[in-house]
């Protein structure tokens, strides 16, 4: 139960921290600044079905934000990858920022681990497109 409440609290913080002013800088891939293409940092494909092409500032690993782009290089979501061990330890996140701007809806799902974030974690996906447009990254 505490884990669920932790995930819900993190989601609330993330939605409230969406920064519309920064949205213009990350609207199209590749984003500027310290962001690097995830596929150039770890062994992952350039485009992940269901997620898109990911960019991250390596200093923010493992949590992110990861910026996800569709095939037309348009930002579709901001993803945070929150390790279970941090949720269980009731870690506080008060400095997470969602640079992608307005959030349409949120998805949360478990992941057992993958290159880049090998430990079990939750993906918290802040979608910047309507639910019907999630298909832009389906394949």
Enumerate the language-model features and the residues they cover.
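Bacterial N-terminal signal peptides that target proteins for export
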Residues: 1-8
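N-terminal short leaders/motifs
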Residues: 4, 17, 24-26
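Bacterial N-terminal signal peptides
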Residues: 8-17
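Metal-centered catalytic cores of metalloenzymes
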Residues: 22-139
């Amino acid at each position: 139960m505490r884990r669920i409440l932790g995930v819900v609290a993190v989601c609330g913080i993330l939605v409230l921290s969406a920064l519309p002013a920064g949205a213009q800088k990350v609207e199209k891939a590749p984003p500027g600044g310290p962001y690097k293409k995830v596929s150039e940092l770890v062994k992952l494909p350039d485009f992940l079905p269901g997620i898109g092409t990911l960019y991250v500032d390596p200093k923010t690993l493992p949590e992110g934000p990861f910026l996800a782009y569709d095939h037309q290089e348009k930002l579709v979501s901001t993803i945070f990858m929150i390790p279970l061990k941090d949720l269980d330890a009731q870690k506080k996140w008060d400095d997470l920022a969602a640079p992608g701007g307005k959030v349409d809806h949120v998805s949360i799902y478990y992941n057992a681990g993958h290159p880049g974030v090998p430990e079990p974690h939750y993906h918290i996906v802040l979608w910047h497109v309507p639910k019907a447009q999630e298909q832009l990254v389906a394949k």
